[in-house]
Each structure stands twice: as C-alpha cells, then as structure tokens.
UniProtKB/Swiss-Prot annotation:
Transmembrane domains' residue ranges: none
Originating organism: Pseudarthrobacter chlorophenolicus (strain ATCC 700700 / DSM 12829 / CIP 107037 / JCM 12360 / KCTC 9906 / NCIMB 13794 / A6) (Arthrobacter chlorophenolicus)
Protein name stated in the entry: Large ribosomal subunit protein bL9
Chain coiled-coil ranges: none
Organism placement in taxonomy: Bacteria, Bacillati, Actinomycetota, Actinomycetes, Micrococcales
Gene: rplI
UniProt-listed NCBIfam families: L9
Pfam families per UniProt: Ribosomal_L9_C, Ribosomal_L9_N
GO biological process, one term: translation
Top-level taxon of origin: Bacteria
GO cellular component, one term: ribosome
PANTHER family registered for this protein in UniProt: 50S RIBOSOMAL PROTEIN L9 (PTHR21368)
Family designation: Belongs to the bacterial ribosomal protein bL9 family.
Alphabetical UniProt keywords: Ribonucleoprotein, Ribosomal protein, RNA-binding, rRNA-binding
C-alpha cells in the first residue's frame, strides 16, 4: 500500500490535502502520473497544511461570491422573451439553459444551467419562480417574467 497526499479532489478517494493509502498500482499508474497526488513524506505534512489553507480560502471566497450573486439575482426580475401563440401558450417550453442565458443577458452574472431548478414546466406566458443553487450553502429564488415575442 502506498501512502499519498492528494493535491486534487479525487472522486471516491478524498479532497485535496487528504492523506490516503491506496494500492501501489493505483498510485503508480493513475494518481502520480496525473499529478493528483504526491508521495507522503515527513516534510509533506507542511504541504498538507498549505493545501488545506488554500482550499479553505477558496471555499470562503466562493461562498462570498455566491452570496453577492444571490443578492443580485433576487434584486430584480429576469425577463424571457419567447415565441408564443395568440392565447399565450409557448411554442415549446422554457428550459434551464434559457433561464441561464436570460440571467446573463440581464447583466446579473453568469450561472451554470445545471444549477437552475424549475419547479414547474413553463409552457405559457406569465410570472414564475426558479431556484438557483449557486453554492452548497447558498440558493437564490429568482422571478421570471415570460413574455411573448417574435
């Protein structure tokens, strides 16, 4: 068994800075060549502390950014202009990607479409709400105004 210090997050194994024991072949053929880990040494403990401190700083910064973006998203409604019939029924449906593009077009920052949750299928003109998961601890509810366009 090889004792390693992870330098990147590895699914099913651990996060950056964790000290793990893996089989020799996994270490030699996968983790070490891809620079996902370093061999453990006594001096490596100092490296572990610096990696953990950097990870904590990144987490804190991403949390602050997510909170700022959540406040901006909740400050004003986002307008989506979509094709609709005379009765207000849409040609198609509003998807997560449409919401993400509308948020970016409104100047409220860029969000990943996978973080948008639509509680109902939007198939007609009107006002709706969407949930956006910006961080594991931060979620925002945004108002969507779906209007008919050309």
């Amino acid at each position: 068994m090889a004792k390693l210090i992870l330098t990147h997050e590895v699914t099913g194994l651990g996060a950056a800075g964790d000290v793990v024991e893996v089989k020799d072949g996994y270490a030699r053929n996968f983790l070490l060549p891809r620079n996902f880990a370093l061999t453990w040494t006594k001096g490596g403990e100092k490296q572990v502390e610096s990696i953990k401190a950097a990870r904590a700083a990144r987490e804190h910064a991403s949390l602050e950014d997510a909170q700022k973006q959540a406040a901006a998203l909740q400050s004003k409604p986002v307008q989506l202009v979509v094709k609709a019939g005379e009765t207000g029924r849409l040609f198609g449906t509003v998807k997560q990607a449409d919401v993400a593009n509308a948020v970016e077009a409104a100047g409220l920052g860029s969000i990943d479409k996978r973080k948008v949750e639509l509680p109902v299928h939007i198939k007609s003109v009107g006002s709706y709400q969407a949930n956006v998961r910006l961080h594991e601890d931060v979620a925002a509810v945004i108002e969507l105004d779906v209007v008919a366009g050309k």
